[in-house]
């Protein structure tokens, strides 16, 4: 219902106010898509050696936090585990990167719809270990 409201009311109103707004939005979207693809290629070239189920915390602490988040997200995706929420990602960063993790450090998550298996990250021998829950 919201989608129809946007399509039938909001977009025509925008089109009246700004000429070729849909075309501009489409062009911007395409530009972002291309930039995203470029980022993905460069990211994987630079950090592919870290994208794994076992990652040294020391290596992650030497990298800017936005890249650490992407390394963790790519590693989770590689294991076919449900992607954690933004809040859980923040907890992972706080627990393993911003703090000094120990053997009891653990962050886990699930999906309410059970569409994908949940995951957990623990700390062992200086590494975070990403596994299915």
Where are these regions (language model features)?
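Noncatalytic alpha-helical scaffolds and linker/capping helices
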Residues: 1-2
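AMP-forming adenylation/ATP pyrophosphatase catalytic core
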Residues: 8-11, 26-133
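Conserved anion/nucleotide-ligand pocket segment
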Residues: 9-22
């Amino acid at each position: 219902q919201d989608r129809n409201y946007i399509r039938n009311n909001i977009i025509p109103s925008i089109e009246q106010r700004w000429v070729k707004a849909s075309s501009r939005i489409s062009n911007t979207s395409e530009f972002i898509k291309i930039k995203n693809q470029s980022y993905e290629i460069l990211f994987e070239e630079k950090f592919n050696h870290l994208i794994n189920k076992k990652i040294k915390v020391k290596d992650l602490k030497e990298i800017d936090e936005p890249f650490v988040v992407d390394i963790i997200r790519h590693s989770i995706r590689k294991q076919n585990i449900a992607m954690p929420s933004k809040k859980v990602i923040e907890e992972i960063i706080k627990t393993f990167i911003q703090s000094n993790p120990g053997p009891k450090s653990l962050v886990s998550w699930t999906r309410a719809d059970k569409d994908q298996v949940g995951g957990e990250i623990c700390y062992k021998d200086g590494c975070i270990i990403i596994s299915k829950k």
